């Protein structure tokens, strides 16, 4: 098996790996995108106020309840340290299970930017064990499709806080794994009724961006890329429930415009040259298009 990324880098490492695995098993994942559209208010809160990077952004999709609803049962086992987890891990691998494991990037040589430099939690997919060479086969599109010496996996596992020292396996129940478009649509409508956005991300950026230092510009870039990826993922769900050509078209335009503005910001970070008036015009355009999209979506499905 060779997992490939599916989600345009919207979900965190663990969720994107789960999605890639389910897709590789022909499990329909798009129905689980019903709540993937993120408000700019939440993106602003996490990225600007909490100073998270886009890779640490937290969103509610792919909850255990949603997985169970689709016949996917998450099975977790916690351990005090890797020495007590290793027998369970080897047993799961011997039974051809794919295992999700958390690790500290500080201890992972293939994570070149973080190794021996940054302590950060990362998800690895472990699919095999070579007992002779004491190495685990890791599938991680962020740096490795190959064997990782057990000593590195052990160090990465044990470096985490106790609550993160877990192994995760997904048990798939073919009998319960059915498509129920009406149930998916009902959940989406319930989510949509509760959805609110005051578009503070755009308003604050328009007000302050000319004075941003580099770290704030990086936050702006991350926020815009989250907006773009969220719209891209959510467009797949809208296409699934109703084909909705007008709404999907609006989403794709917003996705493209957010990515375009993010590219302008990244060029400025590198070259220190930007047409601020032109950038502001595009941000106002995106805000208007986002508001127009949500009004039309609520009018159609609310």
From Swiss-Prot:
Catalytic EC class: transferase
Enzyme nomenclature, EC number: 2.3.2.19
Keyword Transferase found: yes
GO MF annotation list: aminoacyltransferase activity
Domain of life: Bacteria
Keyword terms: Acyltransferase, Antibiotic biosynthesis, Transferase
InterPro entries assigned to the protein according to its UniProt record, in alphabetical order: BtrH_N
Transmembrane spans: none
Pathway per the UniProt entry: Antibiotic biosynthesis; butirosin biosynthesis
Record GO biological process: antibiotic biosynthetic process
Job of this protein: Aminoglycoside acyltransferase that attaches the (S)-4-amino-2-hydroxybutyrate (AHBA) side chain from the acyl carrier protein BtrI to the aminoglycoside ribostamycin in the biosynthetic pathway of butirosin. The AHBA side chain protects the antibiotic from several common resistance mechanisms.
Protein name: Ribostamycin:4-(gamma-L-glutamylamino)-(S)-2-hydroxybutanoyl-[BtrI acyl-carrier protein] 4-(gamma-L-glutamylamino)-(S)-2-hydroxybutanoate transferase
This protein's encoding gene: btrH
């Amino acid at each position: 098996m060779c997992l490939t990324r599916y989600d345009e880098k919207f979900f965190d490492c663990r969720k994107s790996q789960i999605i890639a695995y389910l897709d590789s098993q022909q499990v329909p994942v798009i129905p689980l995108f019903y709540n993937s559209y993120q408000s700019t208010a939440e993106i602003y809160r996490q990225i600007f106020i909490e100073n998270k990077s886009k890779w640490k952004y937290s969103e509610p999709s792919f909850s255990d309840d949603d997985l169970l609803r689709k016949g996917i049962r998450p099975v977790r086992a916690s351990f005090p340290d890797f020495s007590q987890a290793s027998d369970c891990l080897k047993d799961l691998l011997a039974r051809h299970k794919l295992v999700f494991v958390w690790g500290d990037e500080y201890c992972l040589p293939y994570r070149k930017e973080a190794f021996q430099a940054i302590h950060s939690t990362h998800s690895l997919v472990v699919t095999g064990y070579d007992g002779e060479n004491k190495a685990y086969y890791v599938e991680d599109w962020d740096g490795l499709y190959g064997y990782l010496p057990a000593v590195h996996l052990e160090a990465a596992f044990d470096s985490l806080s106790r609550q993160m020292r877990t192994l995760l396996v997904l048990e798939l129940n073919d009998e319960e794994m059915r498509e129920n478009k009406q149930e998916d649509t009902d959940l989406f409508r319930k989510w949509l009724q509760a959805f609110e956005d005051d578009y503070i991300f755009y308003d604050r950026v328009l007000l302050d961006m000319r004075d941003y230092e580099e770290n704030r510009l990086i936050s702006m870039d991350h926020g815009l890329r989250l907006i773009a990826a969220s719209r891209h993922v959510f467009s797949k769900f809208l296409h699934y429930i109703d084909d909705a050509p007008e709404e999907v078209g609006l989403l794709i335009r917003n996705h493209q415009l957010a990515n375009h503005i993010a590219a302008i910001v990244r060029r400025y970070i590198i070259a220190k040259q930007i047409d601020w008036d032109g950038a502001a015009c595009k941000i106002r355009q995106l805000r208007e298009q986002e508001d127009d999209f949500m009004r039309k979506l609520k009018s159609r499905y609310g």
